[in-house]
Amino acid sequence: IEYPDKSTNTDKYLSVKYSVPEELAGYFLKKFGDNETEEMFEAFNKDKSTYIRCNTKKTDIAGLTAALEAEGVMVTNEGIDKRIDYALKISGYDYLGGLKSFRDGLFFVQDISSMLASQGGFIKRDAYVIDVCAAPGGKSINAALMADIGHVSSRDISGRKVSLIKENAERLGIDNITYKVWDAVKKDEESVEKADVLICDLPCSGLGIIGRKPDIKYNVTYEKIKELALLQRKILSTVWEYVKKDGILIYSTCTVTPEENAENTEWLVNNYPFELIGKPEQIMPQDGTGDGFYIARLKRTE
């Protein structure tokens, strides 16, 4: 392949080399510069690892490792963030559903970046957690395992999505989740000031997970990014009231755009009674092992 000249036509060069639409390449260049954009595009083309979360209700990491190895699966904790002690990286299997350990509910698949959203000790054992856009359910399940004597209210916009969460939780034998079909832009009066922790993992452009779902890059335009950022604000402006005073709001996305991430967090702090806890985490696809992901943790102040 003959590539366009990189120095005079960088967006076209990156577009051809990494099979990314030119408009999207131009957007990334404007936001992240030449080097970081190319590193990101390279990361999208690398093989993605499969990470799993141990179902601590049924087993521990040692027990899960032994069960998987007995089925011929290769298991390691290499490259897993030190804050997470219940995850493994697996390879060398044909089909997850064919594994007895999977069918027995000893684990569920969740990317390492996504697991980090619940970290930090904010979900106490007796917490009441609301997860507003919960499908396929990884964060709800993670929260239910942490709040093992507490409760999780897991919601999404359609019956199909909610049944997916339920199916996953039932396979794992998790019984402290209730399910609700609910559109997050509509206020649920019954939930006002009820949540110790509110999980807002909102619909986004998904640009952090292009490595897993390459089709995403053909569907995202700058207009779409702006539309999604507005939808996220619409949801946040509705659901923030569910958080109790001194409760925690976790805002996360699987994207890397400032419009959907840092700018929305700043908007939330400027318009509602919340303060940031620590610095938000923007995980880039090229940072290491997990997907591109954003996490901000905020505390309700009044």
Question: Could you say what each language-model-derived stretch is?
Answer:
Residues 1-302:
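S-adenosylmethionine
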